[in-house]
Amino acid sequence: MSDAATAVRPSAPSAAPATLAERMAAAIVRQRDVVPAVAAEKLKTCLLDFLACAFEAHTLPWARQAQMIATDGAGPANIVGTPLSVPAPDAVFANSVAGHGLVREDMHTGSVSHLGIVVLPVLLALAEEKKVDGRAFIAAAIAGYEVGGRFGRALITPDFARIFRPTGFCGPMAAAAAASTLLGYDARKTQNALSLSANMVAGQNQWPHTGADEMFFEAGMAARNGLTAARLAGLGAYGSEKALDGEAGLLTAYRPDHKAPDIRLFDGEPEILSVFFKPAPVCNFAQTPSLAALALANAETIDPDQVVSITARVTKAAKAYPGCDYAGPFSRVLQAKMSIHYAVASAILRKKIDEASYRNLDDPALLALAAKVTAEVDDGLTAAFPKKQGAEVSVTLKDGRTLSRRLEDVIPADIPLIRRRFDEAASETIGAARARELAEAVDGLDRSGDVGAIMRLTRTAARA
């Protein structure tokens, strides 16, 4: 055997202060059996929302592509809305892509990341490999959201997000933390998983400019990489203790000050409680502007032909995020779903924002209205971000009037809307009776003795 294979791995002197990865790992292990009731209830809603998105998107091209590279019959894990039984990594990738497929996934504003689509596919796949009870599943999910949220708050800035994909950087660590918790790792294995996942981040934000498909697959890779990191750690793989805060650590390398701040997990309100559910299938930064425009359109009679100009006042982060400050033309659906201009114009023209809003990208009336939208940074809204995500829309008419509506924060989708979207999408795919059974299983997640049953209910008898 080679010297490299037999070498003793280094360990920090006992007197040396713990590294950031070690402190985070210790906190994760300490919290494993703590499941706040309010966080558990939020997680159930996150899971229902994720499944609703995955069901509705599972026939879209990017979801199909992710399914087609999976090896059917080679594993125990299911892909939502299909009859496929595949290895866990394949299921993680495909379900993450489908969960992201509508651009309607859950949103953690502080990290500018979609944590549910990386955490939940990993845990669901693991629950199909080995029986897992609901309480352990919930605790692991809460840990994943916590790590992804706190790490993202330490790393992500508007300038960072202009170039790099936040979910691609926060996702692997969130997924690794969740998997390590569910697998019962001790602090050393958990630290190794976190450190390894820090080397598996990826994703550049060039895709919004043309509406390219990288966005969907970045989430799938982040989720799968997090699972890979956790599994490698479980097999004894060693990750640098200073992978986050060393001289070439992830935070040190990417933060503008090249310093790694302390990250305190489970200190205060759980990060999962900061997650909101999108009311519209559009980019996070287009949510509040479109809602303000929708409220204005419903309150006033606005003739599109009489519109001179539209001003959308938004946060600095919203204007800076690639693809958001774009008036067209639009050649791909994702390109339109990123655009504040398109969402505001659609809200005023159609008085709704839904999937149908993105079926005719060449609508002359919509394009003409979108061209009249200007996005401006509002200092007050920027100061309140990310705790609040506000926007104001003002419409100037030919008669000289200016109509305005300001929202100090996004209005998230409420539970009745989430349930309605789930019922419609799941019933169409697996039938109404099975959809009700699945919803009941999610509602009773904390009492479940076998979470894998949830994914078995998502199967179809034959390819849809």
Name each region found by the language model:
Residues 1-112, 209, 214-224, 231-464:
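Terminal-appendage/accessory-domain detector
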Residues 98-155:
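Hydrophobic alpha-helical hairpins/lids featuring a short glycine-rich hinge
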Residues 111-117, 137-141, 159-172, 215-219, ...:
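Active-site nucleophile and cofactor-binding loops and adjacent substrate-binding regions
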Residues 116-124, 171-178, 223-227, 286-288, ...:
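Well-ordered alpha-helical segments within folded domains of soluble proteins
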Residues 130-136, 153-163, 176-193, 206-216, ...:
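Active-site cavity-forming subdomains of large catalytic enzyme subunits
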Residues 141, 145, 191-194, 438-439:
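Short, well-structured alpha-helical segments that form the helix of a local strand-helix-strand
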Residues 196-204:
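Flexible glycine/proline-rich, aromatic-decorated loop/lid segments
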